[in-house]
Amino acid sequence: MRLTKQLIFGFICLLFPLTAIKAQQHNRFVKPFIGTDGTGHTFPGPSMPFGMVQPGPDNRDYGWNHTSGYQFQDTFLMGFSQTRFSGTGINEMGDVLLLPINPKKEQGKNSYDKTSESAKVGYYSVTKNDGVKVELTCTQRVAFHQYTFPENVAQVLVDLQHGLRFVFDPNDAKALVIESSVKIENDHTISGYCSTDNWVK
């Protein structure tokens, strides 16, 4: 009986040599914009399994179609927040909104052309109408932003009061941020925190 099992195993190994097995790149089939239209409640930004951050674009901070902060049909941009729920159908998080702007072009700082937007596994980019290119990626615990400005002048707006509100009327203001602080460390570093109160405590 033992010899029979060894022969069967040997025959199977001959049929499927281990050297012929190659790793496949299945991430080429992933389309991050699926579910970002209508009531799909997803966003196209990068994320990691069980990650602490999900950086991405925020078009609006309230309403049923914007529970992840993003809606594919929109071309208005509030900025790029660092956390969100994707696919749950509930507005939540949207913490620490950043908006890079070109101060020489006031028009276009909050809008973009859909043809400039792209996403793939672990990466999102868009070029705003003021010429600023935004690229996002992340690790398990850190969101990385890279901004490319068309001129020698660059500004980044930091909004610690922003959050994805679980309301359907923009006039139904609900305070999400309990406490916040931001400190400019140097020309390349800011630090801070915000403590929020919403569905997730």
What kind of feature is each model-predicted range?
Residues 1-24:
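Bacterial Sec-dependent N-terminal signal peptides
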Residues 24-201:
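Accessory carbohydrate-recognition regions in carbohydrate-active enzymes
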